[in-house]
Design a protein with these regions (language model features):
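Structural signal for interior beta-strand "rungs" in well-ordered beta-sheet cores
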Residues: 52, 114-316
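Terminal amphipathic alpha-helical/low-complexity segments used for targeting or macromolecular assembly
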Residues: 1-114, 177, 183-184, 189-202, ...
Length: 337
């Protein structure tokens, strides 16, 4: 279930109505009046939720799901366990996106500009001109917030934090002694779209951002909220200016990311990992504890703990050096040698 501090529950819907909305076919029409209250990922789904699987790699999770219903391709329908109603569609993720938009809505700041009467500020909080703080937000003692920054509804911001000017924070739980510099955007929707019957549609991003104690985030950097699970930045990690961290990323403790690093969705990064400037990481890979990624490198697969990888595509540094040396020798050879 999406966090109610950040997402409004729009009320239940029956499976029959959901089938019409999504363009899916309900296999068991006797289940048309079954009530759905939320969307969920396949694993650990609540009993009154609907989920989806568009990749056969998730069918083992479908077989074990506790969801009330699941959007599946017809070829995968048999994977649904007893008690899980199947809605057949050629575009399960698009159907899920439509269901998510019907059942959940992001909370937004309403009312007059300024600090909501429903926000909670501890003693010693300092606000610059033009700061907006939404309903239900909590700001810890000694935190300073710069001019024209926006703290969205429900956000929790710890003690002794420094938030510079023109920062936007939403859908986030932030620890103590966190430093976020000018222009950073925390908790915006992750980049998620899928192809439906009428073209590309946005997938509602229903997760949060968790930033632990002592983290620094540079100017104009972005940390997107999760698609459903959270985006997490571990304790004491230091992030430079203009860094992009996508949805569902999990960054460990004491990591360093130099400027222009880009981390794609659902990447897992261990503790003490270092990234040179303009390094990039493709989605769904794991980078082990203490690994290092060289500047302008492109990581396309898992990096083992403690190793240094460089190049495009990135590979172990010793291999890269041998390849570079061989290429230099070949380039220096005269014709006929």
């Amino acid at each position: 279930m999406p966090d109610p501090r950040f997402f409004e529950d729009l009320g239940p819907i029956e499976l029959g109505e959901l089938a019409v909305l999504s363009g899916a076919r309900l296999m068991d029409l006797s289940a048309a009046s079954r009530v759905i209250r939320s969307v969920s990922v396949v694993a650990g789904a609540p009993a009154d939720s609907i989920t989806f699987a568009s990749d056969s790699g998730y069918l083992d999770q479908v077989r074990a799901t506790t969801a009330a219903a699941c959007f599946l391709r017809e070829r995968d329908a048999a994977a649904a366990p007893e008690g899980c109603s199947v809605l057949v569609t050629s575009t399960p993720q698009a159907a899920y996106a439509m269901a998510a938009g019907r059942l959940h809505s992001p909370r937004t700041a309403t009312g007059d500009a300024g600090v909501s009467a429903l926000a909670q500020l501890e003693a010693g909080v300092i606000l610059g001109p033009g700061v907006v703080i939404g309903a239900g937000a909590q700001i810890g003692r000694g935190t300073r917030i710069g001019a024209n920054s926006v703290i969205g509804p429900g956000v929790a911001l710890g003690r002794d934090c420094e938030i510079s000017a023109n920062v936007t924070i939403g859908f986030a739980l932030i620890g103590d002694r966190v430093r976020i510099l000018a222009g950073a955007a925390i908790g915006e929707p992750g980049f998620g779209a899928t192809l439906g019957a009428a073209g590309l549609i946005d997938i509602p991003q229903l997760g949060r951002v968790i930033i632990q104690d002592g983290v620094s985030i540079g100017a104009n950097s972005c940390v997107d909220r999760g698609a459903f699970n959270d985006t997490v930045i571990g304790e004491n990690t230091k992030i430079d200016n203009q860094v992009q961290i996508a949805h569902n990323v999990r960054v460990g403790r004491n990591c360093v990311m130099a400027a222009h690093t880009g981390i794609s969705g659902s990447v897992t990064i261990g503790d003490g990992v270092q990234f040179g400037g303009r390094a990039g990481v493709t989605d769904h890979v794991t980078i082990g504890d203490g690994a290092r990624v060289g500047a302008a490198s492109g990581v396309m697969k898992d990096v083992p703990a403690g190793e240094t990888w460089v190049g495009m595509p990135a590979r172990p540094v010793r291999r890269w050096m041998r390849e570079a040396a061989w290429l230099a020798r070949m380039a220096g050879r005269k014709e006929g040698d």
